[in-house]
């Protein structure tokens, strides 16, 4: 999820309110701050990518996979190494069903808070657990923020850094209707949708997913996994 940038208790409350009310505003601000990452798909085709962070989760990941099967679409799952070690069968199921996997850290410490050595060790530990991936190798920072030095380390290890362009901030567990509204408002050619399948109660995300998919189809958009849309570094 995108981290809340605040230094005081009052600032945290204000920032959370901003996330809930104006998701696209926050996204635009972060795009200015982080130019060396992938925010959307550069394509002339009417494609979008749907991604899920923080999993796998034994309750919500299977429900999401069932919905994806029902609509015959492929997604990208940014996995946490520690959770892959706990639920290896879910990682295998994600791969077996043809989805793309990416690295979302090993233990979900906020990426921006790690020093370079800690970050590199965490990255490689997660990579070992998640397993080798065909290029491109994809990384999404835990907490949604990352330092320039960390981006350089990712490039050293042949990773592309991916954030996204359509957020619902579902870690805060907004209502299902809000998730549908926030994501559908960002549905356009090249959008990268960011949702979460772990880290808390994700039932509203699961329930919103069919409407999001159907709204994308009504807009003439088709879903692709990121491995088919992003070139390897």
What would you call each of these model-derived segments?
Residues 88, 113-115, 149-152, 173-175, ...:
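Short, well-ordered secondary-structure micro-motifs
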Residues 23-112, 118, 125, 129, ...:
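Active-site beta->alpha N-cap acidic-glycine motif
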Residues 92, 116-123, 175-181, 206-210:
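Charged helix-capping and loop-helix junction motifs
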Residues 145-186, 220-232:
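His/Asp/Glu-enriched short active-site or ligand-binding loop at hydrolase and phosphoryl-transfer sites
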Residues 65-74, 78, 99-100, 106, ...:
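CE4/NodB-like, metal-dependent polysaccharide N-deacetylase domain
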Residues 1-39:
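N-terminal membrane-anchoring alpha-helices
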Residues 79-84, 107-110, 145, 167-170, ...:
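Short histidine/acidic/glycine/proline-rich micro-motifs that form metal-
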Residues 185-228:
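Catalytic grooves of carbohydrate-active enzymes
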């Amino acid at each position: 999820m995108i981290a809340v940038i605040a230094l005081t208790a009052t600032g945290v409350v204000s920032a959370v309110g901003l996330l809930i009310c104006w998701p696209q505003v926050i996204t635009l601000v972060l795009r200015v701050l982080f130019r060396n990452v992938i925010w959307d798909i550069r394509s002339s085709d009417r494609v979008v990518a749907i991604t899920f962070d923080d999993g796998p989760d034994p309750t919500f990941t299977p429900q999401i996979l069932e919905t994806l099967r029902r609509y015959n679409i492929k997604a990208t799952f940014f996995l946490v190494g520690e959770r892959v070690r706990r639920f290896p069968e879910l990682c295998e199921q994600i791969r077996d069903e043809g989805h793309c996997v990416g690295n979302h850290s090993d233990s979900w410490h906020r990426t921006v808070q790690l020093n370079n050595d800690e970050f590199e060790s965490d990255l490689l530990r997660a990579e070992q657990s998640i397993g080798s991936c065909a290029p491109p190798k994809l990384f999404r920072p835990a907490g949604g923020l990352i330092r320039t030095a960390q981006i350089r380390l990712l490039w050293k290890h042949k990773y592309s850094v991916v954030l996204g362009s359509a957020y619902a901030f579902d870690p805060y567990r907004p209502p299902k209707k809000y998730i549908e509204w926030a994501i559908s408002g960002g549905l356009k050619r090249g959008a990268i949708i960011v949702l979460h399948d772990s880290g808390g109660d994700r039932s509203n995300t699961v329930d919103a997913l069919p409407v999001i998919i159907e709204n994308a189809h009504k807009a003439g958009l088709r879903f692709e996994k990121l491995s088919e849309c992003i070139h390897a570094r």
